[in-house]
């Protein structure tokens, strides 16, 4: 048509898409048709209701993560869930799920995500006496591309009331692999935080090489400083008032701790035991089955910021790809990985979350009852 008419290709396409729109040049009519008529393309639906019904439980098992993260691990998760007979897929549905894109996942799950549609407060108090002995991180001795350099932070479970003692969670995040360990303590006393850090060190699948903390007194103290010197662990701190210096662990404070246990107040020994029982399952679920996208580059062009992330991978996958992780450690990680069922871990986590919520509900009922009894005239109304 382009050769016959001499039209530009895209001009000809526009005329044809208009389905005969009248174009007049002088007394001649080049193209005449019904302007109101439009040719509607009808594409068959590839990912139908059968695919969605199987995708939804997998998405729930994976903690409702975004399509990009889910697509990266979906083939592996399907294989594991079929191994433990958590799901049954027909050949056609299985083929479609293995080929589905991240965008299609988000589109299919958009309505479900809307159905499931407070922020924490910092309780950090500065520790000043030892600041001059603990260097601010300058990245000269800090190697973020090697496993073992971690950021640490505390997450308070005060429920909006910072009076008295309440449970705290020590969050330890490896910068290179994003491997995360958590442990709850009864309060922010240095002795409990120090013991929790030593306990977490025994669970890390790699040697602890460096620690970076904020300026809280629970970290800036002689116990931790002397321990790091004795164990030859690099100990650095962020700049005062610059929370983004610990951006990796700050992200995990929400995505791991807050998403799992919420913002309620936990201050009893029973709740402390429940928190740590939950964290035992959560560390396996998060580190082996939750893909993470790491920021590769960030470019600003005027008011626009363009961010580039790497391919989503779990902390376990990142460790297995690292050349500096020994074959012995990789073998141990692989042996643990093949025994894990993400659906079972998710059920156990959900059960422990429900128990935690029950303790909170009981306390609220008791507080309401106490408040009512303390009101003037309550005895008269009761009689």
Predicted region positions:
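Secondary-structure boundary/capping micro-motif
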Residues: 2-210, 215-243, 248-383
């Amino acid at each position: 048509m382009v050769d016959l008419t001499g039209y530009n290709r895209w001009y000809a396409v526009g005329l044809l898409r208009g389905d005969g729109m009248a174009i007049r040049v002088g007394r001649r009519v080049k193209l005449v048709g019904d302007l109101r008529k439009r040719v509607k393309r009808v594409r068959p639906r590839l990912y139908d209701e059968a695919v969605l019904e199987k995708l939804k439980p997998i998405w729930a098992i994976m903690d409702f993560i975004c399509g990009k993260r889910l697509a990266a691990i979906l083939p592996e998760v399907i294989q594991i869930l079929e191994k433990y007979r958590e799901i049954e897929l027909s050949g056609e549905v299985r083929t479609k799920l293995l080929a589905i894109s991240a965008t299609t996942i988000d589109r299919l799950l958009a309505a479900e995500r809307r159905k499931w549609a407070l922020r924490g407060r910092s309780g950090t108090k500065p520790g000043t006496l030892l600041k001059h002995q603990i260097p601010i991180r300058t990245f000269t001795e800090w190697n973020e591309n090697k496993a073992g350099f971690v950021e640490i932070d505390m997450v308070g479970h005060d429920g909006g009331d910072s009076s008295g003692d309440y449970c705290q969670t020590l969050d330890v995040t490896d910068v290179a692999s994003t491997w995360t360990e958590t442990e709850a303590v009864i309060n922010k006393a240095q002795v409990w935080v120090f013991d929790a850090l030593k306990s977490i060190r025994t669970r890390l699948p790699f040697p602890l090489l460096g620690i970076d903390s904020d300026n809280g007194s629970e970290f800036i103290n002689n116990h931790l400083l002397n321990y790091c010197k004795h164990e030859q662990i690099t100990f650095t701190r962020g700049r005062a008032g610059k929370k983004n210096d610990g951006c990796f662990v700050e992200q995990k404070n929400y995505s791991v701790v807050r998403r799992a246990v919420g913002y309620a107040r936990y201050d009893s020994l029973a709740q402390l035991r429940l928190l740590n029982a939950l964290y035992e399952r959560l560390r396996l679920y998060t580190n082996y089955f939750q893909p993470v996208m790491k920021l590769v580059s960030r470019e600003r062009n005027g008011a626009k910021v363009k961010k580039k992330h790497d391919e989503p991978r779990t902390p376990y996958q990142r460790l297995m790809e690292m050349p500096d992780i020994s074959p012995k450690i990789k073998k141990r990680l692989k042996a643990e990985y093949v025994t894990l069922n993400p659906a079972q871990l998710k059920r156990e986590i959900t059960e422990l979350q429900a128990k935690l919520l029950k303790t909170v509900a009981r306390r609220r009922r008791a507080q309401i009852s106490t408040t009512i009894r303390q009101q003037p005239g309550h005895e008269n109304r009761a009689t």
